[in-house]
């Protein structure tokens, strides 16, 4: 089952970029574009091979209320292709765009965390992990907005952080209301 690779490939590449590529930006570019290309190939393969089926993958060996459930249906396949295509083309474009900045490996590590969060939001099967992946994407996007280090970017990042905190609070309240009404966080049981 290839479903967990949508999360592990960009997460592992973000870790490796932070660990290995901290001194050389070329390694960060190579690792991130390789991860982006592999995600694009994997998502296109999933879209072709899916045949209208729904795949469910339980991460770990825990039962459903505790374990992480990943779900891939036709809409998730299409969304994964779109996220992979846009993120890969953004990575290719950003090589030239951020070339003048220092420590570009941080940009690529944050970008891979953003992809991890977006992919997790698409394929998660429960509301708690949806919130966790949404927060991963939100925090990495916040850091990417402030990445350039200029006053306008910090102002935009602050505004984004305020809106993100408000939206996260509202989502968490909504999840609490749904949990109190249904006694489950699994989306398929609601």
Where are these regions (language model features)?
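Hydrophobic alpha-helical transmembrane segments
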Residues: 17-22, 117-123
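Juxtamembrane membrane-interface segments at transmembrane alpha-helix termini
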Residues: 41-50, 118, 142-152, 172
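Membrane-interfacial loop-to-helix junctions in multi-pass inner-membrane proteins
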Residues: 23-37, 99-113, 128-131, 149-170
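Hydrophobic residues within membrane-embedded alpha-helical segments of Major Facilitator Superfamily
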Residues: 13-16, 31, 38, 79, ...
């Amino acid at each position: 089952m290839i479903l967990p690779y949508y999360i592990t490939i960009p997460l592992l590449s973000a870790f490796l970029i932070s660990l290995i590529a901290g001194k050389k930006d070329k390694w960060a570019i190579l690792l991130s574009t390789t991860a982006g290309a592999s995600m694009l190939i994997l998502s296109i393969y999933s879209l072709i091979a899916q045949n209208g089926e729904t795949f469910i993958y339980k991460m770990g060996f825990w039962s459903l209320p505790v374990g992480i459930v990943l779900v891939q249906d036709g809409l998730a396949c299409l969304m994964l292709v779109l996220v992979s295509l846009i993120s890969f083309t953004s990575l290719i474009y950003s090589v030239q765009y951020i070339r003048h900045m220092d420590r570009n490996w941080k940009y690529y590590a944050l970008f891979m965390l953003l992809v991890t969060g977006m992919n997790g939001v698409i394929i998660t099967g429960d509301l708690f992990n949806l919130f966790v992946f949404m927060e991963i994407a939100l925090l990495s996007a916040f850091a990417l907005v402030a990445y350039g280090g200029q006053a306008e970017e910090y102002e935009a990042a602050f505004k984004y952080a305020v809106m993100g905190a408000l939206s996260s609070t509202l989502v968490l309240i909504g999840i609490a209301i749904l949990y109190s009404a249904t006694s489950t966080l699994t989306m398929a049981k609601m």
